[in-house]
Every structure is written in structure tokens, then in C-alpha cells.
Regions:
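RNase H-like two-metal-ion nuclease catalytic core shared by retroviral integrases
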Residues: 151-153, 157-166, 173-196, 217
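Basic, alpha-helical interaction scaffolds
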Residues: 13-34, 172, 188, 192-207, ...
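Loop/turn elements at helix/coil->beta-strand transitions in domains of secreted/extracellular proteins
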Residues: 144-146, 169-172
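Charged alpha-helix within mobile-element recombinases
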Residues: 39-58, 188-237
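A short, polar/charged loop-to-alpha-helix boundary motif
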Residues: 128-137
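Conserved beta-strand elements of beta-rich interaction domains across eukaryotes
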Residues: 93, 114-116, 154-156, 178-181, ...
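Nucleic-acid-interacting cores, centered on viral/eukaryotic replication and modification enzymes
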Residues: 104-105, 111, 134, 161, ...
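RNase H-like DDE catalytic core and adjacent DNA/metal-binding regions
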Residues: 1-118, 123, 140-147, 228, ...
Length: 238
């Protein structure tokens, strides 16, 4: 047994199934590859890999989107220090039926381009003022002030209210015509993860009020963030 294997917890036979199921649910119903790599970073058993490969989730088989997945994010070297640059974008919309009436929800995503740390927050409107407030609450109030803020030419980002916030904090405005490929890939993964989580949560228990629908979307966003932070990051090799 290698030193790496000694550093991990051993999972008894009777507990393996429960551990696999628990991690699969907590990580937002990931695919087998991501589930296997994440579990094998923490636990050891000679038959663990085989049992993970045989694991089947009834909810995933019935309600997750079918077709080609988003795959792995490409590895790359870190060329900037953490907290220097944040890339922001909007993801969604996701459709949720409330009393059989379709409603749409979107979210603001903020990504530290060095570490790939992600923050997600549901938005009510796409106005520059609302996005400004959400960015301040979600990122600026929690982390060191970034040097640069990268975004596309969406009106919510180039609007007067959002630009005022960047000037107030002396953050360099970087309006990119071509989105950051790395951040764009993360946004796509976020979108699909949230949508899959929503499908699993909502099935059999559709929200009857708008308040309940918002709570469900918030739970899905939190699950997606947790999944991104705790699963193996292929871009950083850890």
C-alpha cells in the first residue's frame, strides 16, 4: 500500500454503498468520473472504484439531461495571483413551473480566474443597478478587492450603475469581446449542474408558490457551488 493510500480513510464494506450515495447527492449528482476521483481522494478500498463504476442513481437516469456532457475543464497554469481578477457573467434561465405556470430564473456568477472559486447568486432582474448590488453583496463584501473585473458587453455590466461601483473601488474595467474560455467553461458547467439539481429536486414536489420556487433555486445554486468547490478540479490538478 502506498503512502497516499495510508493517508486516506478506509471504508468498511458495509458502509461503502452509503458513502457513495451520500457523496453523490451532496455533490449535486455528478457523473461517475467526477464522483470516483473525488471519493478516491478521501477514501481507500481495493474494491471502491469498481463499486462506484457500478453505482446507478435512479433520479439521474430518469431526470438528468441526456446527451453529451460538459466534460473536463482543460488544465492550465496559474498566471495571476488569487483575488487579482474576477470574471462575472449571467447564467440561466432555468424554467420552473409554479402552479403549472412556467417561471424563469437566472443567476450572477463570479469567478476568481486564478483559483476558479465560484460564487452564485439568484437575480430578480437584469438591470445594471440590481447586478451592481448583487456583485457587491456576493463578492466585494466577502473577498479582497480585485484589481480587474472581466465581463462581456451586456448592458447590465456596461451600465452606469455597475460602472460607478467599479470606479468607487478603483477596479479596472475589462470589457472583453470574447469571453474568457476558462470562465466560460465554468459557467457552462454551472448552468448544467444547477439545471440537473433542479430537475431532481422538483420532480414529485413542484413548488406551489413563488417563494418556494425561489428557495428551491437558491438550494440548487448552493449545491452547485459546493460541488465545484469539493470535487476534483482538473484545471488545477487537485
Amino acid at each position: 500500500m502506498s503512502d497516499f493510500e495510508y493517508s486516506r480513510n478506509t471504508v468498511p464494506k458495509l458502509d461503502r454503498s452509503e458513502v457513495i450515495t451520500w457523496f453523490h447527492q451532496v455533490l449535486g449528482h455528478p457523473g461517475q468520473t467526477r464522483l470516483r476521483e473525488t471519493l478516491q481522494q478521501r477514501y481507500y478500498h481495493p474494491k471502491l472504484r469498481g463499486q462506484i463504476d457500478k453505482f446507478r442513481c435512479e433520479h439521474c437516469q430518469r431526470y438528468k439531461l441526456s446527451g453529451k456532457g460538459y466534460g473536463l475543464l482543460p488544465e492550465r497554469e496559474i498566471r495571476i495571483a488569487p483575488w487579482e481578477e474576477v470574471a462575472i457573467d449571467l447564467i440561466g434561465p432555468w424554467k420552473v413551473k409554479v402552479n403549472n405556470k412556467p417561471c424563469e430564473f437566472s443567476a450572477l456568477t463570479c469567478i476568481d480566474t486564478a483559483s476558479n472559486l465560484v460564487e452564485l447568486v439568484r437575480i430578480d432582474t437584469k438591470t445594471s443597478e440590481h447586478i451592481r448590488d448583487k456583485f457587491a453583496q456576493t463578492w466585494l463584501c466577502r473577498y479582497p478587492r480585485p484589481i480587474r473585473c472581466v465581463h462581456d458587453k451586456g448592458g447590465e455590466f456596461i451600465g452606469r450603475e455597475f460602472q460607478w461601483l467599479l470606479e468607487l473601488f478603483s477596479i479596472k474595467d475589462v470589457c472583453s469581446t470574447s469571453k474568457n474560455p476558462q470562465s466560460n467553461a465554468i459557467c457552462e458547467r454551472m448552468h448544467q449542474t444547477v439545471e440537473n439539481v433542479l430537475r431532481v429536486i422538483i420532480h414529485g414536489n413542484p413548488p406551489k408558490t413563488m417563494s418556494k420556487a425561489k428557495d428551491i433555486v437558491d438550494d440548487a445554486l448552493a449545491t452547485a457551488m459546493h460541488a465545484m468547490r469539493t470535487t476534483v478540479a482538473t484545471t488545477l490538478g487537485s
